[in-house]
Swiss-Prot record:
It comes from the Bacteria. Keywords: Cytoplasm, Elongation factor, Protein biosynthesis. The keyword Ion transport does not apply. One of its GO terms (molecular function) is translation elongation factor activity. It comes from Phocaeicola vulgatus (strain ATCC 8482 / DSM 1447 / JCM 5826 / CCUG 4940 / NBRC 14291 / NCTC 11154) (Bacteroides vulgatus). Pathway: Protein biosynthesis; polypeptide chain elongation. Pfam families: EFP (PF01132), EFP_N (PF08207), Elong-fact-P_C (PF09285). SMART domains: EFP (SM01185), Elong-fact-P_C (SM00841). GO terms for cellular component: cytoplasm. Belongs to the elongation factor P family. PROSITE patterns: EFP. The keyword Magnesium does not apply. GO terms for biological process: peptide biosynthetic process. This is Elongation factor P.
Length: 188
């Protein structure tokens, strides 16, 4: 059990039989009344974000989670097979438990988060920024730079990303996997 004032970003708590991760918090001390914590909690199972207010003295059930690096090996049926970098054990993870699955490549190292008490995989996080080569995009027209125009491009994982007109096929770009947005061109 932890006190509400001990909640930080990344803290895992169990509430109403569901597991939540804190993604944002604010310690509020109003001029009148008791101090409280305003939090944003993300449901691990379905990804819903819930705003919740806790009184400072309130006790919450904390969950100990482990974050370990795993390497993506291959796909088998509907599952993705990952290998633990420390023990070399292989585990299957379902498609819907992987954040940023569209940008997953063989050999990529991801963080697998699991419940420490039950060893159940909660989710896997692809790195926030990845570098990928563009496999197909339409050529940009010379002089078509009056506005910040974007065009679709397919990267080596098969995902489609919106990139600026000056990006050509064969170039390597950096992508933010949280929203699939173009970050920049990678210098060779």
């Amino acid at each position: 059990m932890i006190n509400a004032q001990d909640i930080k970003i990344g803290t895992a708590i169990r509430m109403d039989g569901k597991l939540y991760f804190c993604i944002d918090f604010l310690h509020v001390k109003p001029g009148k009344g008791n101090t409280f914590m305003r939090t944003k909690l993300k449901d691990v199972v379905n990804g819903y974000v819930l705003e919740r207010r806790f009184n400072i003295g309130e006790k919450l059930e904390d969950v100990r989670v482990e974050r370990r690096p795993h390497q993506y090996l291959y796909m088998e049926g509907a599952d993705y097979i990952f290998m633990n970098q420390e023990t070399f054990d292989q585990i299957p993870i379902a498609h819907d438990l992987i954040n940023g699955v569209d940008f997953l490549l063989e050999g990529m190292v991801v963080d697998v988060v699991s419940d420490a008490s039950t060893e159940t995989v909660l989710f896997a996080d692809v790195p926030v920024k990845v570098q990928m080569k563009i496999t197909y995009t339409e050529p940009g027209l010379k002089g078509d730079t009056a506005t910040n125009t974007l065009k679709p491009a397919t990267v080596e994982s098969g995902a489609t990303v919106r990139v600026p007109l000056f990006i050509n096929e064969g170039e390597t770009i950096e992508i933010d996997t949280r929203d699939g947005s173009y970050v920049g061109r990678v210098k060779a």
